[in-house]
Amino acid sequence: MKPFLIFQGPVATRSGYGDHSRDLLRSIIAMNKYDIKVISLRWGNTPMNALGPDDSDISSLIHTQGNLPSPDVFVQVSVPNEFQRHGKYNIGITAGMETTLVHQDWIEGCNRMDLVVVPSEHAKNVLLNTVYSKMQDGKEVDKLLVKKPVEVLFEGVDTDTYFEIKKHDYQKLGDATIKESLDTIPEDFCFLQMGHWLQGDHGHDRKDIGGCIETFCKAFSGRSKKPAMILKTSHATFSILDREDMIQKVENIRAHFKDAPNIYLLHGELTDSEVNSLYNHPKVKSMVSFTHGEGYGRPLAEFSTSGKPIISTWWSGHKDFLKHSVRLVGQVGQIHESAVWDKVIIPESQWFYVNYKFAQKALQDMYSKYTKQKELGRRQKYYITNNFDLKTMDKKFVELFSKYVPKPVSEMALDLPSFDSMELPTLQKAGE
């Protein structure tokens, strides 16, 4: 009989945590060692329609009614302040933190688990380096810090889903909807920026989408020939109101510039196949990210498979895998009060700020010297597909289970003591 494992996470949501949850769950299923049940949770306001007919391997395991017995292994994918013990052995998996500090509730949550798994060295270091003092009568009586083991397991790229489509193959392999939409763009050179446009004043939302748009406009406004930007973004929903709000935000920035370059908003749900077609469309030449911080940076990893160059900040989680890119300089500084998120992004923490003047030049160089810059994309594609793919992640996950998760009694080797050989006396019948 296989040991019982409960996997709890946002497996049905269209979110970064949802993507990661599905990858991890499939990795555990492939181990073929556990009787698995899944508790599917919401993730903010993100849609819960990510599981389709081809995802029966996951949907068939989702528990819908009644109580479940306490499992041998409990795996929870969430933010650490929500971590709870429900099994004999408990694993908490989180994307970690994009800043330099975590809230004390995160530390307490990590200490409730037996093992904590994060996707990057940055996330691990932030958890282990955040220390709070416990005070009593004005004196420090103890320290609050993570005492449980923290291991890094990167978010592997599914190279069967994300892969390079050569220009001459795009007509055959590219998604028709994406092709039709982007073919109408008159510009032949487009930068791609993607990610949720989160809370924060201008320049202080976590992805710094506003700052990137402004820098792009500064770089190319007034030029007779200029590139465009494709912006794939939303708040957390794909509603009409959300779309109109995104359009207004973009126009509010462009209005400050005369003859600004075009910015095309891509808003709404995309399948993985559509996203890969977006990355590979011949008009999309480069991805750009001014992100203040990433726990990992999954879109940057997935875009790498296209073989096209990336312009990005060089701080936090994506440093692990983004070896060949245009690295934007800047400095680490205090987060703005408008970006504070209760018990998640705390006011005492810091993150990265791009040097906009340097970034403006980087955008201009990517446009004017693209032939030279393409070599970065080719090198990065080779690096990501050989070191950070899904199969390599699966292998490491198996190693973590073998290292930390106690084996069931049925799998344990029984070491019996050895005895010297013994000679038994010869028995004789009575009377002989």
Predicted features by range, described:
Residues 276, 301-309, 316-320:
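Short alpha-helical segment that forms part of, or immediately flanks, the ligand-binding pocket
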Residues 115-175:
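Donor nucleotide-sugar binding/catalytic pocket of nucleotide-sugar-dependent glycosyltransferases
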Residues 6-8, 45-128:
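Extended catalytic core of nucleotide-activated donor transferases of GT-like folds
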Residues 277-295, 305-308:
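Acidic donor-binding loop of glycosyltransferase active sites
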Residues 1-71, 217, 228, 395-398, ...:
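N-terminal pre-catalytic "stem/leader" segment of glycosyltransferase-like enzymes
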Residues 20-22, 26-27, 35, 158-277:
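Conserved catalytic-core segment of nucleotide-activated headgroup transferases in glycan assembly
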Residues 235, 341-432:
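C-terminal amphipathic helix plus adjacent low-complexity
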Residues 309-312, 326-327:
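Short hydrophobic beta-strand element within catalytic cores of glycosyltransferases
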